[in-house]
From Swiss-Prot:
Keywords: Crown gall tumor, Endonuclease, Hydrolase, Nuclease, Plasmid. NCBIfam families: PRK13858.1. This is T-DNA border endonuclease VirD1. One of its GO terms (molecular function) is endonuclease activity. InterPro entries: VirD1.
Length: 147
C-alpha cells in the first residue's frame, strides 16, 4: 500500500492478523451453548467487563480446575488424617489378634464405624467440590470477589 492511498480489504486483513499475534500471549477459544454464553456475558457486563477480560480474570483466579478454599482443604486434610489414624488402629487390632486370638469385637466395631463415618465425610466433601452447579455459583462469586 502506498502512502496516502486507501487500504484495501486484503491490507486490513493482513494488519488484523499481525496485530492479533502479540508476543507472550496465546489465544484460547471455547465453544459455549447459547444459554451459557448469554449467562456468562450478562454476568460479565454487570461487572463492567468484556467477555475477554472476564475470562482472563477467571483463569487467573482459579489457578486450577478444582480450586478449593482453605476451609475445605483443612477439612479434607483432617479427614485424611482421621482415616490414617483409623487405619493404624485397625492394624494394631489385627496385630493384637495375631498375638492373642481372642478378638475384642467392640473395639473392632468402634473402629469400623469411625472408618465408615470418615469415608462418608470424605465422600460428601468430594461431591461438594465436584458439584457442577455449586462450582458455577462459586465461580460467579469468585469472579466478583476478584475485582
Amino acid at each position: 500500500m502506498s502512502q496516502g492511498s486507501k487500504p484495501t480489504s486484503s491490507d486490513i486483513a493482513i494488519n488484523q492478523r499481525v496485530g492479533a499475534t502479540v508476543e507472550g500471549f496465546r489465544v484460547v477459544s471455547t465453544r459455549l451453548r447459547s444459554a451459557e454464553y448469554e449467562s456468562f456475558s450478562h454476568q460479565a457486563r454487570l461487572l463492567g467487563l468484556s467477555d475477554s477480560m472476564a475470562i482472563r480474570v477467571a483463569v487467573r483466579r482459579i489457578g486450577g480446575f478444582l480450586e478449593i478454599d482453605a476451609e475445605t482443604r483443612h477439612k479434607m486434610e483432617a479427614i485424611l488424617l482421621s482415616i490414617g489414624t483409623l487405619s493404624s488402629n485397625i492394624a494394631a487390632l489385627l496385630s493384637a489378634y495375631a498375638e492373642n486370638p481372642t478378638m475384642d469385637l467392640e473395639a473392632l466395631r468402634a473402629e469400623r464405624i469411625a472408618f465408615g463415618e470418615s469415608f462418608a465425610d470424605l465422600d460428601g466433601l468430594l461431591r461438594s467440590i465436584l458439584s457442577v452447579s455449586r462450582r458455577r455459583i462459586d465461580g460467579c462469586s469468585m469472579l466478583k470477589d476478584s475485582l
